[in-house]
Amino acid sequence: MTAFSFKKEDRLLKRYEFIEIFTSGKTVHSSCFLAGIKKNRKERIRLGITVSKKVGKAARRNRIKRHVREFFRLHRDNLSNCWDINVIAKKKAVNASPAELERSLAELFHKSSREFPSDRQ
């Protein structure tokens, strides 16, 4: 079992990492989110979160980011390793309830795991 923290090594930090995901990765959609996914050379899954100003003011954008981080933190063990994932919030995410956001994230990660099967047995 891994620790439930969201360490620096688990995050996408550099601009070129985000760009690389969308130039050479694949995308999956859910009702409130879009995700770019690309295989990495690390031994861990890494997450990036993008919420543009078009989605809402800072407090609303931060709330969405907190929900994404928390979902990732709790469900990281169920996801395949060696992937970079950038989750982008759609405008619909602002008005969604926490339950809707969680359902949408579950759908997104389910689609991504179907698209990219786990290396683990």
From Swiss-Prot:
Q: Which GO terms describe its biological process?
A: tRNA 5'-leader removal
Sorted alphabetically, the keyword list is: Endonuclease, Hydrolase, Nuclease, RNA-binding, tRNA processing
Q: Single GO molecular-function term? A: ribonuclease P activity
What are the annotated GO cellular component locations? Answer: ribonuclease P complex
The enzyme's main class, written as a single word, is hydrolase
Q: Which NCBIfam families match?
A: rnpA
Main role?
RNaseP catalyzes the removal of the 5'-leader sequence from pre-tRNA to produce the mature 5'-terminus. It can also cleave other RNA substrates such as 4.5S RNA. The protein component plays an auxiliary but essential role in vivo by binding to the 5'-leader sequence and broadening the substrate specificity of the ribozyme.
Q: How does it assemble?
A: Consists of a catalytic RNA component (M1 or rnpB) and a protein subunit.
The protein's matches in HAMAP family, at most eight in alphabetical order, are given as: RNase_P
Instruction: Give the UniProt family note.
Output: Belongs to the RnpA family.
Question: Per its record, how is this protein called by name?
Answer: Ribonuclease P protein component
The encoding gene: rnpA
